[in-house]
Amino acid sequence: MKRVALLVQYDGYHYSGWQKQKNATTVQEILESALFKITNHTVKTFAAGRTDAGVHASGQVVHFDIDSVIPGFSYSNILNNLLPSTIRILESVEVKNSWHACYSAVYRHYRYVINNGKFPNLFINNWSWHRYQKVLDEVLMLHASKTMEGEHDFFAFQKSGSNRRNSVTLIKNIDIKRVEDLILVDIKATGFLYGMVRLIVGQLVLVGEKKISSDIFIDRWVNKKKNDVKESAPAKGLCFVNAVYEENVFKKVNNNDFFPLFLINGFS
């Protein structure tokens, strides 16, 4: 039995998230169906992050165990011939059986893209939130967001329906920058709560539009005022960029290799 890791890219617009569920098309379901065609038996997959419906991934990490003579590096080409064009395997490698796509990850990186331009742009419409009513003050947004760095209880930024035991997580870094009309919100954390990034972005946009102050933003999450956190950014602007491990298992470790070219600027 060997363990194979996949570097996966998908357009979340077409799927009801990563995780398999009844009466919905998900990325995990499609991927496991393709693996079944190869092996003729059920293969369970595990992902670094469980993206929600409509959320994209430029560098999702997945692993599965399989008893096969097919070398690990061959699965990328084999799977790409079976998968729809909205799911691509960028790389496949054999890894140690002790390595786990989820539990071995040191942190995950999500990026949210806001199109703050006056006019819509069809070429990025499905990968960004067109919030154009007011010019956003990204400096105010960054100042407010920096208070969340470190280990905190983010109960206010967790949608109902989560099965997590607690709402404490460690945010390693938050960066917000403007690249012309685009505002890029990058969050790196050891783990993310259900709907966390979209709720954070929804509140930060209110700060950027000066509808609420930084103090109000901070008060809402520090004092767990979940009922005051009502605005959630649309799913289409969110992308799971990658998961980082103590040892790189893929050759494609440069984000620029697989993140949409028009959204690369400002990557760190």
Swiss-Prot record:
Keywords assigned: Isomerase, tRNA processing
Entry EC no(s): 5.4.99.12
Keyword rRNA-binding: no
InterPro entries reported for this sequence: PsdUridine_synth_cat_dom_sf, PsdUridine_synth_TruA, PsdUridine_synth_TruA_a/b_dom, PsdUridine_synth_TruA_C, TruA/RsuA/RluB/E/F_N
Catalytic activity line of the entry: uridine(38/39/40) in tRNA = pseudouridine(38/39/40) in tRNA
Recorded GO MF terms: RNA binding; tRNA pseudouridine(38-40) synthase activity
GO BP, one annotated term: tRNA pseudouridine synthesis
Pfam families in UniProt: PseudoU_synth_1
Highest taxon listed in the record's lineage: Bacteria
Record bears the keyword Hydrolase: no
Active-site residues, record numbering mapped to chain: D52
CDD domains according to UniProt: PseudoU_synth_EcTruA (cd02570)
UniProt: substrate binding residues: Y110
Assembly with partners or alone: Homodimer.
Family: Belongs to the tRNA pseudouridine synthase TruA family.
PANTHER family linked to this entry: PSEUDOURIDYLATE SYNTHASE (PTHR11142), TRNA PSEUDOURIDINE SYNTHASE-LIKE 1 (PTHR11142:SF0)
Function: Formation of pseudouridine at positions 38, 39 and 40 in the anticodon stem and loop of transfer RNAs.
Protein name: tRNA pseudouridine synthase A
Source species taxonomy: Bacteria, Bacillati, Cyanobacteriota, Cyanophyceae, Synechococcales
